[in-house]
Amino acid sequence: MNIFTLSFAKAKSLDESRFCVVSIARFVPRGFKGVRCYSLAPSRELLHDYKSGLSESSYKVRYLKELGDSVHIHEVFESLVPFCKGRDLVLCCYESDGKFCHRHLLSDRVFQLFGYRINELSC
C-alpha cells in the first residue's frame, strides 16, 4: 500500500477500486464518500486562529503538537489499513497543490519520524 496526498477537488476523479480516499480535514465537501480521519485534521481552534491571522510558522508548531508523538501517528495509520483493502491510501484536504497546508506538514512529519515519503499524487 502506498500513501499519497491530494486536494479534495482532484480526488473526485480517482478510481475507488484503486484508491482509498481519506479526509484529514475537519470538514468534508458535500457528497464525500471516503473515510474521515479527524485524528490527522487540525483542531477547530487551530483552523479558527489561522483564518484570524495566525502565522504559518505558529500554525506548524501547533499542528505538530496536536498530531502527537510517533506512537500516536503510527496507530492512526494502522487504524486506516482495514479500510483500504489493498488499495493505495490518499489523504485529502481542501488546499490546492503548492499552497501552505497541513497535509504537507503531516507528510514531512511522517518522513522525519519513519523515513517514509508521502508524495502528492499526480493525476
Model-derived segments and their meaning:
Residues M1-C123:
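Residues lining hydrophobic/aromatic ligand-binding pockets adjacent to catalytic sites
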